[in-house]
Amino acid sequence: GKSRHTKDYIEKRGKIQISNELKDRPEEANNRSRLGDWEGDTVAGATGKACLVTYVDRKSRFLKCMKIAKKKSDLVKEATIQLLKEEPLCTITPDRGKEFTAHPDITEELNQVQFYFPLPRHPWDRGTNENTNGLLREYFPKGKDLTDIPEEYIQEKVDELNKRPRKCLGYKTPYEVYYSETLHLI
């Protein structure tokens, strides 16, 4: 079975340097009043194999996703830069996973975007992303090896999710909300 640690166990694999706490995140990000506040995470496939890097815009629920070969911080960094470099960008709220240790490099690369980290083991602080990852799991069940799944198929499923009406958006799709807003920004 899975090995577990006692409650006194201290993690020895290094600590992630936290740049900002979630409580310091701007109010506009907290109340979803603007585009460009992203929540990030990784969706693991089979253990040690390929995974998905996901970012969800808090206001529109618009999903950006990319497959990477392994859950490594340098690969997550490259995927993040590629996914978000053309998008409106105000804040990023990832989880506290070791895969986000390269966040200072991402900040430098993406116009000084600030990262806001939630408390450890508080996934509900990034509920938008966790919910969307749950929707992604309809297509990519837990433990499924993502290595042989083509990027085109993944993007097809991401597009399906972005074009699915959501009750919280007044039955508009994330795509409609995101692109009607970004067109106003131009």
Language model segments and positions:
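Mobile-element integrase/transposase regions
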Residues: 1-52
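Mobile genetic element proteins and their domesticated derivatives, centered on retroelements
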Residues: 41, 55, 61, 80, ...
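Active-site beta-loop-alpha junctions of metal-dependent nucleic acid enzymes
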Residues: 45-48, 65-86
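Coil-to-beta-strand transition motifs
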Residues: 48-50, 58-63
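Short, well-ordered secondary-structure micro-motifs
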Residues: 50, 102-105, 128
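Short, surface-exposed connector motifs at secondary-structure boundaries
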Residues: 60-64, 84-90, 139-140
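Acidic/histidine-rich, metal-coordinating catalytic segments
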Residues: 87-102, 120-121
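Charged alpha-helix within mobile-element recombinases
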Residues: 107-110, 114-115, 119-186
